[in-house]
Design a protein with these regions (language model features):
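Tryptophan-centric aromatic hotspots in well-structured domains and transmembrane helices
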Residues: 34, 95-97, 200, 204, ...
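Conserved acetyl-CoA-binding loop-helix of GNAT-fold acetyltransferases
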Residues: 13-25, 194-208
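Conserved catalytic-core subdomain
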Residues: 220-232
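A conserved beta-strand-loop-helix scaffold within acyl/acetyltransferase catalytic domains
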Residues: 39-195, 207-209, 225-226
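Conserved GNAT acetyl-CoA-binding A-motif
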Residues: 27-41, 210-222
Length: 232
């Protein structure tokens, strides 16, 4: 399985074939029987579909919700060449208000890079808040060790963020930055103090990181493709 792969020039058919031939050899050595990819390519790219079909892949592109491993539909913010002030000015008035409200109410934020020493208490706080979020919203949550290993593996390309109120962690996120994109990967919030809007401030801090890194896109990640008001 290659999440969001392949990582190469998808128009270079020779490179693509060499890449997948190599992947097939690895799969055979590991007794694999299936290769799955979730490429970051628009569904309207018919040439890519033809190229992948020629390589033996079958396109499954009819799902509207979260049937796959990676989301088919994402929400992205265009920040190419924009300053913080320009990006903030394009937010809805209520969004700007909530970002400022969090700071006004005394919410503070802190981040740790994956290539640095992340305090165990920070990882524990994030994992605990994730458990709270999972129970509230009814989804399975990864372990603390999983998040620690992921941050360590991604190194300087990942950050753990926590929001605090009166010294207590109340919200947390993990973001990753590669090339010209920054991804909001995980988010968690306490059942308490949600009225001080810590998530808005954390989102803004991650967007600021994306702007500082010269990114073109800030990706909020998965949303449903079914826009019906009746869709839960």
């Amino acid at each position: 399985y290659a999440p969001r792969g392949p990582v190469c020039d998808i128009r270079d058919t020779a490179v693509m074939r060499e890449l997948f031939d190599g992947a097939a050899q690895v799969a055979k050595q590991c007794r694999g029987y299936l290769m799955q990819i979730d490429p970051d390519v628009l569904n309207s790219d018919e040439q890519f579909k033809r190229d992948m079909s020629a390589l033996g892949f079958a396109c499954e592109g009819d799902s509207l919700n979260f049937e796959g491993i990676q989301p088919r539909f994402v929400f992205r913010l265009d920040i190419a060449g924009k300053t913080e002030d320009e990006v903030l000015a394009h937010f809805e008035q209520k969004t700007r208000y909530n970002v400022r409200l969090a700071a006004k109410k005394g919410v503070t934020t802190q981040f740790w890079s994956g290539d640095g020493d992340i305090p165990d208490e920070a990882l524990t706080a994030f994992a605990d808040i994730m458990q709270t979020t999972g129970k509230r919203d009814r989804f399975l949550v990864r372990s603390k060790d999983y998040f620690a290993n992921m941050l360590r593996a991604l190194g300087k390309h990942a950050r753990l963020y926590l929001a605090y109120l009166d010294g207590q962690p109340i919200s947390g996120t993990i973001a990753s930055q590669y090339g010209d994109k920054t991804w909001y990967m995980y988010g968690a919030s306490s059942n308490e103090h949600r009225n001080v809007m810590p998530n808005y401030l954390l989102q803004w801090e991650m967007i600021r990181w994306a702007i500082a890194g010269g990114c073109r896109i800030y990706d909020f990640r998965g949303v449903s493709g079914d826009l019906s008001p009746d869709n839960p």
